[in-house]
């Protein structure tokens, strides 16, 4: 057998749950990179991870590097021998260094001459002698922001390390990892099974840990088990568990032997908005809330414990006692907050600074209110509701509930607005103003919500750029990139008839004399246009398509999107590459013209059949294209323009544009200028690759 399975395990103290997957994936990626660098073949590799261990398993790993022949070139033959044909000192020194005589050297003939060469056979190194060093290098490259030392050890790692195991098949690999000598000892569960045991073979790792150590080392298996058992537990009480993947990942990273249990809380707490209860259950306690078929929160929750108890009722009771005070806090905050309207909290916003040069939160909501009304007027939304929602948009930040449970901002604003008797549009806008919160999140769809969300983001963008604090490098303390993408997505996905230039100008005017950067509006526009490029690239749109549209500088995002879609479709047409090349040729010709470009086409000067045909085709298309351009139906316009391919090809085949006759030349330049202008109504397709 010339291959074996490899197991490497690092036994540690409890690893940070939110970092566990990343650590394990990085460990595997780093180690397989080491294998590739060492030219060690293997079939597959996987990672395992539990709260107190990181492990990797490599299947069918070659037991040694393959032997290889290394060409060692010596001096040129012309300088390797003297006039009498005897080896020179240079040749003899080279041969001696390679363990051969000059006579044993081979000859290599190249186009630059003939050389002495020695094809040396290099035997592959045994894998077992390489593993420890490769594993250590893989660990050294793990993404650990704050490593720690322990005991008298000088070694640093994310948590103290207690065991290291490296097995190639049944053979123990000698060496150290993070200062710990490799041994067969593997630690089991803290409270169940064997505290530690000897691992005989790499292939026994998962089974032995599960049977002897009461540890499910396979992260994905553990995660799947928790999900399945939680779903079953919820179904038993007539509900559906809210199993968010990020929480499921965290819970799977906290337990080695997951046991799913169901608990309950008093129904009186259901009078509190469910979002606050869910926040404390998921965020603080790592519980899975349960909802009925109508989406209403049930007075139950599902939790995962790390031990099989003889008395699970005691564990359930303990968790119920832990969560009760948190729910009682939420109830108290809610009842206290209801005593004051959101409007009554407006003066308190004056005590909170938004930004030193941009004023307080009260200043900000005043600007948001005015800008939201301006946007609503342009989109056909209720401007009165938009202004009201903008004014109240940050008042829930002053409530006890949001101060305690920060992730409920906006959501609690919606509930309090309803209790205050605000319109439903205002209430919904209170929650949706922060959308989209992350990549993949939905955007607000209601008109008032869109107006407030846009106003909030644009106020921040223009304000921060206006005081000269634009993002630099990776640093973006005000999350301006996310705000910019949010602005674009809201406008594009709702097809809103808004122009960025107008929005930026209005936002800048509302800041008054606060802004010190005279170029703020231009910089914000450039920033937004750059986000367009990043956003479309993430969606898989070709860079050349994006650049073709950017060349026209459309500042209406919905219009920009229509152009992107049209050019993307145009690229799929058979005629696109030829027309792109022709447009590039036209651009190059026109760029060389000094002074103003001729624009008038004189039909009597169209002497060649090919130019007559092209002019006729353009005349035929223009009345059809005009309404398409006016209605932003760019896809249909480019589809019609694709029909020009044969006429354009024939024109360049038969017609000399730069004719000696000045009148003919200018007429042909005017024809080409007209041709290019039709395409430029959509994009500069000469930039398509």
Curated annotation (Swiss-Prot):
It is found in: Cytoplasm. GO terms for molecular function: arginine-tRNA ligase activity; ATP binding; glycine-tRNA ligase activity. InterPro entries: DALR_anticod-bd, Gly-tRNA-synth_bsu, Gly-tRNA-synth_heterodimer. Its EC number is 6.1.1.14. One of its GO terms (cellular component) is cytosol. GO terms for biological process: arginyl-tRNA aminoacylation; glycyl-tRNA aminoacylation. Keywords: Aminoacyl-tRNA synthetase, ATP-binding, Cytoplasm, Ligase, Nucleotide-binding, Protein biosynthesis. Pfam families: DALR_1 (PF05746), tRNA_synt_2f (PF02092). Belongs to the class-II aminoacyl-tRNA synthetase family. NCBIfam families: glyS. This is Glycine--tRNA ligase beta subunit. It comes from Shewanella baltica (strain OS223). The lineage of its organism: Bacteria, Pseudomonadati, Pseudomonadota, Gammaproteobacteria, Alteromonadales. The gene is glyS.
